[in-house]
């Protein structure tokens, strides 16, 4: 058998079937709608698959609807039944039909004519921001306070000089912070971006119905708050460009001061970007910089008061893992405070999902391998632009979620009878150390006691803002389209890690595409599956190896096993993780429950029977364990409720079946009568068939028992789901092993480096099952989780965080139980 192996980065196009026709996406669609390119099917495309694709392809779901439970009025607002049918369009496809002119010259100058006809003028944007902020009462108070600290015992004249000095400092800070939007620069940048985006993106897709909702929101004369996920530096320009193309004024963008570099900073200022410190506490003694905080607060308030649009990245920084990170709600709290003070009547919030076939940064392998982040510079920006012009990054999809009223959300939350949420320590320690009381089980028992709601109450305010941020990020993440590179990378890592024939990969790609659509997530691609798969393989570059087998005239696709390549594949694979995250949690929990029952010897003759109550509890505890990996569910739902719903889906799929009555009666009495420390909340209990409808619902209720299907396709799906969480659980379990050798106190940064080195060593020695378990993001998340559940105590010494073991986990036995708890979910 003759074989030749090449990486796709240097692939010989003669190896590709119908290479002359392999041009997926390179055509700029002449239709506004997203239509299939009419590619000729390649040889590995079977007639059966063609028939299945035409017959089974699902209608695209409309994503981004706001939460009906929290904002029922906004649910009906801006939306009508015709919006989902408006379809998609390619924003960067512009010709004379998008202008008022026709003819040969209009075709040649279509970009110039298009940007010239956009509605953007100086009157749209804020004026006199610096003076208004300096004259605000909060800033004046901060200036006086800082001046008093400079001259605590000074005379009136010295105090006046100190105030003038602080005012000059405040004005200088504002001059660096405040954006001066230039309509001319926006037009020029729009023209440049049309040229650039067409050179390194094949298209940028938006849903026309979503833009109609955004346009309707702009007509309310209320400030809009755009809150996108953060994947790439190009995010800053992308949103402004799309809004500009649709005659919607540019938002003011909160940018980190790491981008405050010569020339580039001027461009960002002219486009509406304003720079903020990445850390607000930058005084030499580590105290809060009250002057800077007051100026930033005043700046945001003034923009909102003048009905400007804002764009804030809740994650704070670009995601290095490919997953949506946890929220940092600092600036969002300023927005909430502004609304609470009745400065403005309302704010419309718009979560935004952004998906890339391939980010312009390519990957974050350097940082994931523990290398320090390189500071941005003018030279690095120039090199980045040159690099982008030499490559193509495929498709981009931007989804605008339905705008919702922030006022409605806040008022609704203030009236809900919700008790204070459990800390991770309260929720998880009883599961790790069973001798402790089970606080998680009593989570809902206090829900009937309605707390007094007062936005001035700091604890309630913090909880309210945190929940709002989680709500927004969950919606934005749910709105993110799944790209072809996400699915292909996921299949190669967690279904076919040893390699797979291209024809089989295409079949599995089609099946997974249908699974994604069935879960109401949209796709960022269209067309024949074999062409889309080849498109994804090309973009994944050196991460994938293609071997040509001349005997079968077939290709064999293998993921690269080098650590950087696996890290990169994992980054793109994580783009699809949120689609299956809850199902993966249930799959791992099924294993944990079965493994515990099998090793404990109490299963008796139960076979595959498992307790539904126990499964839901186990899954909920795993949700808590993984809560630092992103927003798993809406904050208006408990983990118990979400796990219960997901178990119901497994029953619908046929993966789990409710045991027959005779089988449930055969359950050993010791197991059937097992008492839990606390009852589950009402939605998670199951009535006995014999229980009288008028009986007290608080009495002990009968559990329900489930069977796990042994069908081959169901077992394969469970295995796939378990592998999705494999890297996370391996990282956490390895971190738990490393805790056994802890010698403290130790600076957190030093401990992170040691733990990361340990995980990388496991990978280099082929001890690790998943090489991607050694990413630096997982190291940080594992240590943060251990701090949250009380494994480590954290103290501050000279502005540095120092870790030491808590008294609870000083005994080796407690650390061993932590390890055993995490390992219970790990499928060996």
From Swiss-Prot:
Residues 80-120 are annotated as: Important for mitochondrial localization. A motif (HXXXXD motif) lies at residues 230-235. It is found in: Mitochondrion outer membrane. Its EC number is 2.3.1.15. CoA binds at residues 278-279, 288, 293, 328, 462. The HXXXXD motif is essential for acyltransferase activity and contributes to the binding of the cysteamine moiety of the acyl-CoA and the phosphate moiety of the glycerol-3-phosphate. This is Glycerol-3-phosphate acyltransferase 1, mitochondrial. It comes from Rattus norvegicus (Rat).
């Amino acid at each position: 058998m003759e074989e030749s192996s090449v990486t796709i980065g240097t692939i010989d196009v003669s190896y590709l079937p119908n290479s002359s026709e392999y041009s997926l996406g390179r055509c700029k669609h002449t239709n506004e709608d997203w239509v299939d390119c009419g590619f000729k099917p390649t040889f590995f495309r079977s007639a059966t698959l063609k028939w299945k694709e035409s017959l089974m392809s699902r209608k695209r779901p409309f994503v981004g609807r706001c939460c009906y439970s929290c904002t029922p009025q906004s649910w009906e607002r801006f939306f009508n039944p015709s919006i989902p049918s408006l379809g998609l369009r390619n924003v960067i496809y512009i010709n004379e039909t998008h202008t008022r002119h026709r003819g040969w010259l209009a075709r040649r100058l279509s970009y110039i004519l298009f940007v010239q006809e956009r509605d953007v003028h100086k009157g749209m944007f804020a004026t006199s921001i610096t003076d208004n902020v300096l004259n605000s009462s909060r800033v004046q108070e901060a200036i006086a306070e800082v001046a008093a600290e400079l001259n605590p015992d000074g005379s009136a004249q010295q105090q006046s000089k100190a105030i003038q000095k602080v005012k000059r400092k405040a004005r200088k800070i504002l001059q660096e912070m405040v954006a001066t939007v230039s309509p001319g620069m926006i037009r020029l940048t729009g023209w440049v971006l049309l040229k650039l985006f067409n050179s390194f993106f094949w298209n940028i897709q938006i849903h026309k119905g979503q833009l109609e909702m955004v346009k309707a929101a702009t007509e309310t004369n209320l400030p809009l708050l755009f809150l996108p996920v953060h994947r790439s530096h190009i995010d800053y320009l992308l949103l402004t460009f799309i809004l500009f193309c649709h005659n919607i004024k540019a938002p003011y963008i909160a940018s980190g001061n790491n981008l405050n570099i010569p020339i580039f900073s001027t461009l960002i200022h002219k486009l509406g970007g304003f720079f903020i410190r990445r850390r607000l506490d930058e005084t030499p003694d580590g105290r809060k910089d009250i002057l800077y905080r007051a100026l930033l607060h005043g700046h945001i308030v003034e923009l909102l008061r003048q009905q400007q649009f804002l764009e804030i990245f809740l994650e704070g920084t670009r995601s290095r893992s490919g997953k949506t990170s946890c929220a940092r709600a600092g600036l969002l709290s300023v927005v909430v405070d502004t609304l609470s003070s009745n400065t403005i009547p309302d704010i419309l919030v718009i979560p935004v999902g952004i998906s890339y076939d391939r980010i312009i940064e390519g990957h974050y392998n350097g940082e994931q391998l523990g290398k320090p982040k390189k500071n941005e510079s003018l030279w690095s920006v120039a090199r980045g632009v040159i690099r982008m012009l030499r490559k193509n990054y495929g498709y981009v999809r931007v989804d605008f979620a339905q705008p919702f009223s922030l006022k409605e959300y806040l008022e609704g939350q203030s009236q809900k009878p919700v008790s204070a949420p459990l800390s991770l320590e309260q929720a998880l320690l009883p599961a790790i150390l069973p001798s402790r009381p089970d606080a998680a089980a009593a989570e809902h028992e206090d829900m009937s006691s309605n707390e007094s709601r007062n936005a001035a109450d700091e604890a309630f305010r913090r909880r309210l803002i945190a929940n709002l941020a989680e709500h927004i990020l969950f919606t934005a993440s749910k709105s993110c389209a799944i790209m072809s590179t996400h699915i292909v990378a996921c299949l190669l890592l967690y279904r076919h890690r040893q390699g797979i024939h291209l024809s089989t990969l295409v079949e599995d790609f089609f099946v997974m595409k249908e699974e994604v659509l069935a879960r109401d997530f949209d796709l960022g691609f269209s067309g024949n599956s074999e062409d889309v798969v080849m498109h994804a393989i090309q973009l994944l570059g050196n991460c994938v190896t293609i071997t040509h087998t001349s005997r079968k005239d077939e290709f064999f696709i293998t993921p690269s096993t080098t650590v950087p390549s696996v890290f990169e594949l994992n980054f793109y694979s994580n783009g699809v993780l949120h689609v299956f995250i809850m199902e993966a949690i249930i799959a791992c929990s099924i294993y944990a429950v079965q493994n515990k029952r099998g090793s404990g010897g109490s299963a008796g003759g139960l076979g595959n029977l498992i307790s539904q109550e126990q499964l839901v509890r186990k899954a909920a505890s795993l949700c808590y364990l993984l809560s630092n990996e992103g927003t798993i569910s809406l904050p208006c739902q408990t983990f118990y409720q979400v796990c219960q719903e997901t178990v119901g889906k497994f029953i619908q799929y046929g993966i789990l079946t409710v045991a027959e009555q005779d089988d449930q009666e055969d359950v050993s009495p010791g197991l059937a009568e097992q008492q839990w420390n606390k009852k589950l909340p009402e939605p998670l209990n199951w009535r006995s068939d014999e229980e009288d409808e008028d009986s007290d619902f608080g009495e002990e209720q009968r559990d329900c028992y489930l069977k796990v299907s042994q069908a081959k396709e169901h077992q394969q799906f469970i295995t796939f789901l378990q592998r999705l969480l494999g890297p996370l659980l391996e990282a956490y379990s390895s971190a738990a092993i490393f805790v056994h050798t802890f010698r403290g106190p130790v600076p957190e940064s030093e401990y992170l480096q040691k733990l990361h080195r340990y995980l990388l060593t496991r990978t280099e020695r082929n001890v690790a099952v998943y090489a991607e378990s050694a990413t630096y993001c997982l190291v940080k998340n594992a240590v943060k989780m251990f701090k949250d559940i009380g494994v480590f105590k954290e103290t501050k010494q000279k502005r540095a965080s120092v870790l030491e073991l808590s008294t609870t986990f000083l005994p080796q036995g407690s650390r061993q139980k932590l390890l055993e708890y995490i390992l219970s979910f790990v499928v060996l």
